[in-house]
Design a protein with these regions (language model features):
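Conduit-forming functional cores of very large proteins
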Residues: 153
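Surface-exposed acidic, glycine/proline-enriched linker/cap segments
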Residues: 226, 287, 291-308
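Aromatic/acidic polysaccharide-binding cleft in carbohydrate-active enzymes
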Residues: 265-293
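Active-site/ligand-binding-proximal alpha/beta "capping" segment
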Residues: 205-265
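Glycine-rich phosphate/pyrophosphate-binding loops
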Residues: 156-174, 250-276
Length: 522
């Protein structure tokens, strides 16, 4: 802050601010107190300012560290590293409507929400990911199986069952049909009969249909969260992988002790990226999963193991680990609960690493748990058909309103010059952030991703196409397509949601989003 205070002697900030405001521009000054805060504190504060400047951020982000101040270098580096992740998290309408349709099928079928009002939080939970070190340490889980709540995450369930174990809870997060594909390959009726599915509301309805008992949860940063739940009912940081989901659910339930197995987020050898008994080394692995593994192996990066040794990881695993570290930090600081790392992979911050002997010592005096009572207590009250239809109509009214307001703003664009394109795009973004989000809350996520993608594409090409005739052609077509999207949005939404839920004949729930492309064009 001393730099800013000193600048007051030589800089007339008021005149600068007024000149920027006169042109419709803006300057933000972020002043810290008590010196420069560490990157994990400073970066989010700066980040929350920058994301209000879309599409200029991240498209035109230029970082100038005045007088090369050393404390600011890690802050800038962290934000630069998160920019691509930011772009990949925007989402888009096609995926949102697909998830929403899945959610309506699940609610219409009477799937109840997960509740947590009267549960035993002292119950230790073992949460299992699909990392290769699960094979090394599975025996200690077997020794203490009756003393823990066993939670499988996504594809890790194949390794758990292959080891002769059966989870109490299985968690899933993805709305893609690959979720159904991998679960449908399990030939153990006992799993579907006795294991409780805790899945995101937007799971394909076929997934809930596989299980005798299934409850849904609401993940953060989605329109579904504000439509079908309260803030206290939203599960935070459940993405990007099912492993995150398992830890997020345990954190949401405020379980006092969690043990993280198979959460390696890295591997010592390039061909040891998952447990040997996982679906990734099975002849049942689908072509889609094979292609995904192949692409990931081309983008390996190095990280540090829990023992301080170098190891390999995928960018997605790195992101997943960082997200879990936010959960373990929340558990340690705010919940005063314990997170134990029982994996032999990458180091996970805010956890205590336990050897097999230390795990045995922990459970020596522990008694067997009453998991059945715990699982029954998680069942909430499902929505009625009438309540569901009211939510559908409310979202439809929201889409109609923003379609009109954004169309008016877009039609004010009379030139293809970059400055004019940016001006209109910034106006639309400010409308979204300052008008739509305050009024509709998380519901705005339903359309935010597609709006941001359109704005980013228009501005990026207005800058990159130097030939005026080519730029005129592209921006004119971009404006037309953007306007048509906004115009058709309410009618398309109504065409999808006007059915009676659940509807076994609905083609949307029989394929994944790629296979449904022909339906989006109708």
């Amino acid at each position: 802050p001393e730099y800013f205070f000193a600048s007051l002697y030589v800089t007339d900030w008021e005149s600068l601010f007024r000149e920027f405001e006169r042109k419709g521009n803006k300057i933000d000054i972020l002043v810290s107190s008590g010196g420069v805060a560490p990157p994990e504190v400073s970066s989010p504060a700066l980040w929350n300012l920058l994301i209000n400047y879309g599409p200029s951020f991240p498209l035109c982000a230029l970082f100038y560290n005045h007088i090369s101040s050393e404390p600011y270098n890690p802050i800038v580096k962290r934000i630069q590293g998160d920019m691509h992740f930011f772009l990949n998290q925007w989402g888009y309408y096609d995926d949102e409507i697909n998830q929403f349709n899945n959610a309506l099928h699940n609610i219409g079928a009477g799937v109840p929400p997960m509740s947590y009002n009267q549960i035993d939080t002292d119950m230790p939970a073992v949460i299992v990911g699909g990392g290769p070190s699960f094979d090394m340490r599975v025996e200690e889980i077997k020794r203490h199986r009756d003393k823990v709540l066993l939670i499988s995450c996504g594809t890790s369930v194949h390794s758990i069952i292959a080891a002769g174990l059966m989870p109490d809870i299985h968690v899933e997060i993805e709305s893609h049909m690959l979720t159904y594909d991998h679960l449908s390959k399990i030939d153990q009726p006992e799993f579907f009969e006795n294991t409780l599915l805790v899945g995101a509301l937007q799971l394909p309805p076929q997934v809930f249909n596989l299980f005798k008992h299934g409850y849904y949860f609401l993940k953060d940063s989605t329109a579904l969260a504000s439509m079908f739940g309260t803030e206290d009912e939203i599960v935070h940081r459940a993405t990007p992988t099912c492993t995150n989901t398992g830890v997020a659910v345990a954190t949401h339930l405020k379980l006092k002790s969690v043990f993280l197995y198979g959460m390696d987020f890295g591997f010592p050898e390039k061909n040891q990226h998952h447990s040997k008994n996982s679906i990734y080394f099975s002849d049942k692995m689908s072509d889609s999963i094979k292609e995904g593994v192949k692409r990931n192996l081309e983008k390996l990066v190095e990280t540090e193991s829990v023992h301080g040794d170098p190891m390999y990881t995928f960018p997605m695993y790195n992101t997943s680990r960082m997200s879990i570290e936010q959960l373990t930090k929340h558990r340690a600081i705010y919940q005063k609960t314990e997170s134990y790392a029982c994996s032999e992979g990458a180091r996970i911050a805010n956890t205590e690493y336990l050897t097999p002997d230390a795990v045995d010592d922990f459970f020596t005096t522990r008694k067997d748990i009453a998991s059945t009572k715990f699982l029954k207590a998680l069942k909430g009250t499902p929505f009625t058909q009438k309540q569901m239809r009211e939510k559908i109509n409310k979202l439809g009214a929201f889409l109609t309103e923003i379609s009109r307001s954004f169309s008016v703003c877009l039609n004010s664009l009379k030139s293809t010059e970059p400055e004019d394109v940016f001006r209109v795009c910034h106006t639309i973004n400010l409308n979204l952030l300052q008008q739509v989000f305050p009024k509709y809350g998380l519901t705005a996520y339903f359309i935010r991703g597609s709006i941001w993608h359109y704005l980013n594409i228009g501005c990026a090409h207005s800058l990159s196409i130097e030939n005026k005739a080519s730029r005129d052609k592209f921006i004119t077509e971009w404006k037309s397509n953007f306007g048509k999207f906004l115009e058709d949005l309410p009618a398309h939404y109504d065409s999808i949601t006007s059915k009676q839920y659940p509807d076994s004949e609905d083609p949307w729930v029989r394929n994944d989003i790629v296979s449904n492309e022909h339906l989006y064009a109708e």
